[in-house]
Amino acid sequence: MSQLQVRHDWKREEIEALFALPMNDLLFKAHSIHREVYDPNEVQISRLLSIKTGACPEDCKYCPQSARYDTGLEKERLLAMETVLTEARSAKAAGASRFCMGAAWRNPKDKDMPYLKQMVQEVKALGMETCMTLGMLSAEQANELADAGLDYYNHNLDTSPEYYGDVITTRTYQNRLDTLSHVRASGMKVCSGGIVGMGEKATDRAGLLQQLANLPQHPDSVPINMLVKVAGTPFEKLDDLDPLEFVRTIAVARILMPKSRVRLSAGRENMTDELQAMCFFAGANSIFYGCKLLTTPNPEESDDMGLFRRLGLRPEQGAAATIDDEQAVLAKAAAHQDKASAPFYDAAAL
């Protein structure tokens, strides 16, 4: 009998009851649903690039790109087009069919939109799907990006509405929901998830998933991030989350949003192979691959492929994953810091 339910009216107590299930029961339920919709042995592969690093005016307490915290990160302007295209060609050669671009902004400026649209068009001309995360979007900006051919847009909710004020004060929860609404209305696909391990309670993890699952349409992709603690940020000394609670979050996300991609996102570099294996069984079916986070590297491509072989997993053919995570888009920023001579797009203000 099928356990799959596509609903948009989940109550908090229902979700908390799922979190409270014995682990074996929860994993059985999540994996059964996962198997109904997806090939459980295929994992979508994502490649991404930070196209503008640092100097963000927001105060997200987890983020080393905030200008408010001394994390040793050097700010950079928008990358030159040829630099972006070189990275995209490399990603395609490595097997990616979707290229993901992220900028550390509160929101893109209107004067940067022509350049961003050109970037979308030129990456698409390589035969790749495109995705971006640029901060908040107006309805007009979402329509412009959609008209340029952007396939996916990421904007995370981060946590529950109740805990949100302890994480961020410079934009509201409604700001985030409005951006998701603009993206969906434009015809682009929505990527939205959150970060766990930020000192939140279990009910906050349930609240985050409730918000995502009760959107008018489920996100096409749901990145679940484990906090990457970066020196200099307010969250650098938080206690580690019990890894099994992370697995529970993946499993409940799969149950609530059975047809969405559930992305095992930032924080994998600190996860054991055994923990990742449990996440794949619980319903995660996408990863970031070959990327480098600001402070620590993502698992090496060879390590990921070795893990795939040990688990009998294979990369999904013909579809690489999207950029759906503002924390994971911190990817590659550290690598760029060592390229002081790299060309930038001069017209864009920091």
Swiss-Prot record:
Belongs to the radical SAM superfamily. Biotin synthase family. [2Fe-2S] cluster binds at C100, C131, C191, R263. It catalyses: (4R,5S)-dethiobiotin + (sulfur carrier)-SH + 2 reduced [2Fe-2S]-[ferredoxin] + 2 S-adenosyl-L-methionine = (sulfur carrier)-H + biotin + 2 5'-deoxyadenosine + 2 L-methionine + 2 oxidized [2Fe-2S]-[ferredoxin]. [4Fe-4S] cluster binds at C56, C60, C63. NCBIfam families: bioB. One of its GO terms (biological process) is biotin biosynthetic process. Its cofactor is [4Fe-4S] cluster; [2Fe-2S] cluster. The keyword Iron-sulfur applies. InterPro entries: Aldolase_TIM, BATS_dom, Biotin_synth/BioAB, Biotin_synthase, Elp3/MiaA/NifB-like_rSAM, rSAM. It comes from the Bacteria. Its EC number is 2.8.1.6. HAMAP family: BioB (MF_01694). The keyword Metal-binding applies. Binds 1 [4Fe-4S] cluster. The cluster is coordinated with 3 cysteines and an exchangeable S-adenosyl-L-methionine. Binds 1 [2Fe-2S] cluster. The cluster is coordinated with 3 cysteines and 1 arginine. Keywords: 2Fe-2S, 4Fe-4S, Biotin biosynthesis, Iron, Iron-sulfur, Metal-binding, S-adenosyl-L-methionine, Transferase. Residues 41-268 form the Radical SAM core domain. This is Biotin synthase. PROSITE patterns: RADICAL_SAM. GO terms for molecular function: 2 iron, 2 sulfur cluster binding; 4 iron, 4 sulfur cluster binding; biotin synthase activity; iron ion binding.
